[in-house]
A protein has these predicted regions:
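Sec-dependent signal peptide recognition
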Residues: 2-10
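A generic structural signal for beta-strand entry/edge sites
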Residues: 13, 123-127, 152-154
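Solvent-exposed loop/turn segments at secondary-structure junctions
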Residues: 78, 95-96, 134-135, 164-167
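Early exported N-terminus immediately downstream of N-terminal targeting peptides
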Residues: 24-101, 105
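Short beta-strand edge/turn micro-motifs at domain boundaries
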Residues: 140-142, 146-169
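N-terminal signal peptide c-region/cleavage motif recognized by signal peptidases
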Residues: 15-19
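Surface-exposed, charged secondary-structure patches
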Residues: 99-141, 196-199
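Low-complexity, intrinsically disordered terminal/linker segments enriched in charged
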Residues: 159-199
Length: 199
């Protein structure tokens, strides 16, 4: 189940066309177009895995608010860091995030995606509710997207919840565990991130 969730997180967060502005700015339509394009892209056997990875890195940088996600996952420790340490963390987190996504690259086919509805929480956030329809090979999977709309013309994905599991919260808890076990030494977290990136 964990492997399935990781794969769905990968699909949900990173795949769309190379032109981020080709999608509608209305949150429900944006997510619907993005994911349906994603499934088609990843199931295309004419695209090599290497080319998919390159495309995915560009896509993620355009459509996911990686900087905001990184600051959230770092937690309150970010308030104690100097500018050099923050700059280093942001750079490492971006590389960590991209590798984490591309390492889940696989093939997708015969997955039916549906938008269930949405809930505008504020002027800057909308939760889009969706699901992967049940099939003979997998159960129904519910996915809720947190879409940041401060710039109405360019929505960004800040989090998603797959069957109750928040990607952002899970990552924050993982980093907090590392820091709490090492007296909040940010250099230990840097080492862990570098180890993953270079592995």
């Amino acid at each position: 189940m964990r492997k399935l969730i990781n794969s769905l997180v990968f699909v949900a967060l990173v795949v769309t066309s190379t032109n981020a502005y080709s999608y509608d700015s209305e949150p429900e339509i944006f997510i619907d177009e993005l994911v349906k394009d994603a499934i088609g892209t990843l199931s295309d056997k004419n695209i090599s895995k290497a080319d998919k990875k390159k495309k995915i890195e560009i896509i993620a940088l355009e459509n996911v608010d990686i900087d905001a996600l990184g600051m959230y996952t770092l937690g309150s420790v970010r308030k104690t860091l100097d500018q050099d340490s923050l700059k280093k963390y942001k750079s490492l987190f971006e590389k960590y995030f991209l590798k984490s996504l591309t390492s889940r690259l696989t093939d997708y086919s015969d997955q039916k995606f549906e938008i269930i509805g949405s809930d505008q929480k504020s002027e800057t956030y909308t939760i889009v509710n969706s699901k992967i329809v049940e099939s003979s090979s997998q159960p129904e999977i519910k996915i809720n997207w947190r879409v940041y709309t401060k710039n109405p013309a360019k929505p960004l994905i800040r989090d998603l919840v797959v069957e109750g599991l928040s990607l952002a919260k899970t990552q924050k808890e993982e980093f907090a565990s590392i820091l709490n076990s090492n007296n909040n030494d940010i250099n230990i977290l840097f080492l862990k991130l570098e180890e993953f990136i270079n592995n």
